[in-house]
Amino acid sequence: AEDRKSLSGLTEQEAQEFGTLYTQGVAFVAVIAVVAHALVWAWRPWLQ
């Protein structure tokens, strides 16, 4: 198998690892945002 660098400078394995971490990070931030919105909605509802 070729271990040639891509345009990003990452190997396929490194790109897979980065993609996994990036996806987990985005999901974590999304969960925090949903929880924050739920707490604010419970405190002071909007769009009644």
Swiss-Prot record:
InterPro entries named among the record's database cross-references: Antenna_a/b (IPR000066), Antenna_beta_CS (IPR023623), Antenna_beta_dom_sf (IPR023624), LHB-1/5 (IPR002362), Light-harvesting_complex (IPR035889)
Q: How does it sit in the membrane?
A: Single-pass type II membrane protein
Q: Where is the protein found, in the record's own terms?
A: Cell inner membrane
Q: Name one GO cellular component term.
A: plasma membrane
The signal sequence is: none
Q: Name one GO molecular function term.
A: metal ion binding
Task: Please give one Pfam family short name.
Answer: LHC
The processes (GO biological process) annotated in the record are: photosynthesis, light reaction
The residue spans the entry assigns to the Cytoplasmic side of the membrane are as follows: 1-20
Instruction: Identify the SUPFAM superfamilies for this entry.
Output: Light-harvesting complex subunits
Sites where the protein binds a bacteriochlorophyll: H37
Provide the transmembrane region boundaries. 21-43
Q: Which family does it belong to?
A: Belongs to the antenna complex beta subunit family.
Subunit and interaction comment: The core complex is formed by different alpha and beta chains, binding bacteriochlorophyll molecules, and arranged most probably in tetrameric structures disposed around the reaction center. The non-pigmented gamma chains may constitute additional components.
> What's the name of the protein?
Light-harvesting polypeptide B-885 beta-1 chain
Q: Which organism is it from?
A: Rhodocyclus tenuis
